[in-house]
Amino acid sequence: MKKVYNVLAVMMLAAIMSSCSQKNNDTFIVVANESDLPRENETVEILFKALQDINEGLTAENVVILDAEGKQVPSQVYTEADSTTVKLVFQASVKAGETVEYKVQKGVREDYPVKAYSRHVPERKDDYAYENNKVAGRIYGPALNGPNDPRTFGSDIWLKSTERMVIDERYYNELEKGISYHHDYGEGMDCYKVGNTLGGGALVPHVLEQKEIAGENFVLQKEKLVYDVVGSVITGNNWATCKHVCNGPVRTKAVFTYEPFNVGNVKYSAVRELELDANTHFVKWVTTFIPEEHKADSMVVQLAAIKHDVIAEHVDKEWVAFTEKASDPQDNEQPGNISVAVVYDPADLADNPIKYNGTSPDGHACIVTKEAVNKPITVWTGSGWSKAGIDSPEKWTEMVKNFAYAQKHPLNVTIKK
């Protein structure tokens, strides 16, 4: 009997040691909020290899993120456009001044619904449409490069008052059933006007243009967007190529290239990244302007969005927010208000003083500064609707202010083994 007890004791001790060893080998992603602003559903981004290096057998198919209560947190593993960099993203909620730990382990992933989605829409003249559970929009593609078409980096804002994905349904109804997406049937619409403007926001070159005034003996210098000979805003043609990177429960992403276009005496091509995460009203754009033959080291750029029937506006150093009346061609009484914002990366503006922020001569809310060429420049464009939670200009201004503050005070993310 004594031998039996000894065997049982050894087995229990081994189990305890195994349990302790397993706990000691647990991996945690530690998210610290050192700011004065609570963060709700803010995306955390980790190089997946950093987790794989300390977790043998961890894959995109079996990685699970758990919160403090042991519940799965929706996560996403995707490969960047370079086909090499692999990232894991999930969203954390952390109170001001606090730290939260998320456990990483191998397991069976739950079926997380897609909350960030985008795609090329060849059936609608090469649109590239994007959405999350809060906002939606599109940019125009090469099929709209005609002389009377909108040629712009600017985005078209789509309004939505539902958390489900709607762009595929709206395109199908518009193109196959003749049900216009320009009218609100209860969940939103496309009533925003872009044309040859920067629409809901974009980063573009900005030049000092010299115009000779007929009959006068002087030259007038006027700061403005780059204009073509007929006076339309241009940034070259619409995107030439696009590469879809991912959709998922946390993030959608795509990369666009633009053919060379003239900016003063220099030709530039451009690369733009679109990144939209779940649970936000703000789209991240990373733009790189590439001069031909290295003819420039720096350039003046303008982050801007067109203003229509504006009822409120707030201009800050790093952002501009405004609210304007929406317009439904079939229902002028009930369209509500659209809120729009542009936000410049505060890290960039710390090194590049602002030349101007306010309203440009052609009616854009804008921030003008100087940047190096061949440099990825990060900005955000934001939108909201009074029928989808953004019920006052004051609420929108506060949301934009807090978002800009969060970019200046990012979460501190580390891995603990």
Place the predicted regions along the sequence by residue.
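Beta-strand-rich recognition/accessory modules
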Residues: 81, 86-94, 342-417
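Solvent-exposed beta-strand/loop surfaces of large extracellular or lumenal domains
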Residues: 58-85, 262, 309-324, 347-355
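C-terminal motif of bacterial Sec signal peptides marking the signal peptidase cleavage site
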Residues: 18-19
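Alpha-mannosidase-like glycoside hydrolase catalytic domains involved in N-glycan trimming
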Residues: 24-119, 150-154, 158-160
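Solvent-exposed N-terminal domain segments of exported/luminal and surface proteins
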Residues: 103, 108-232
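Acidic, contiguous internal or C-terminal segments within carbohydrate-active enzymes
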Residues: 244-299
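Polysaccharide-binding surfaces and accessory modules of carbohydrate-active proteins
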Residues: 24-27, 298-354
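Sec-dependent signal peptide recognition
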Residues: 2-10
